[in-house]
Amino acid sequence: QSSAYGYAQALDGTWSEYKDDTGRILARRSNIRDASDFMGWYMTKTKRRNGISLADTRNQYLAYHEGQTGFARGSYKRKKWLINIAGKVANRSDMYKRQLSRCGRL
């Protein structure tokens, strides 16, 4: 049974680490702003720990799903279904990037 909860599907231990690191002791996983901030915090840690650019949607997604240690071990490589989803997430990100570029928001 996973402890993943809220918009970011953050695990209990990782959420506690986030609150300790950021000092946001009142942050809630059920609050979209807090969950979004958590994701930024986690992705920045992933960049530092795993060397994955913030612009690398595919690998950031894989590391978010598998955890930073799981990603480093390559646990996702045995999960073709997950690799396919990560590709779809990256394609969606590229589509949003193009749309934002056209409307002058990027």
Regions found by a protein language model. Name each.
Residues 5-59, 63-72:
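Alpha-helical segment that forms one wall of the substrate-binding/catalytic cleft
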Residues 55-106:
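Catalytic and substrate-binding regions of cell-wall glycan-acting enzymes that process beta-1,4-linked
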